[in-house]
Amino acid sequence: MTTLNQAHCEACRADAPQVSDEELPVLLKQIPDWNIEVRDGVMQLEKVFLFKNFKFALAFTNAMGEISEAEGHHPGLLTEWGKVTVTWWSHSIKGLHRNDFIMAARTDEVAKDAEGRK
């Protein structure tokens, strides 16, 4: 079985199924420390990454941009002094798709190698 951080995103159309109630806890176990947030009725994955300063936070944001472009799936990114909040959800289905969990796992991989982490 391919782990989430090794998987690739698939095209997600408006008729793609959201992650089921049965799949959700299984997938969440593979991305510890990510939180479920619900905004405007839309379930999202969110995690805050801490850095020593703005420069390191911005570098992480740019690294996230690179992997997001490569996979064709893009997060919400809030870059602040010493902190980046990453939020994943699938806009087309207004909820969570397996792609969001794949990208959350990939985000954790990028964060492991990010310079200036707290």
Curated annotation (Swiss-Prot):
It catalyses: (4aS,6R)-4a-hydroxy-L-erythro-5,6,7,8-tetrahydrobiopterin = (6R)-L-erythro-6,7-dihydrobiopterin + H2O. One of its GO terms (molecular function) is 4-alpha-hydroxytetrahydrobiopterin dehydratase activity. This is Putative pterin-4-alpha-carbinolamine dehydratase. Transmembrane segments: none annotated. It is an enzyme of class 4 (lyase). HAMAP family: Pterin_4_alpha (MF_00434). Belongs to the pterin-4-alpha-carbinolamine dehydratase family.
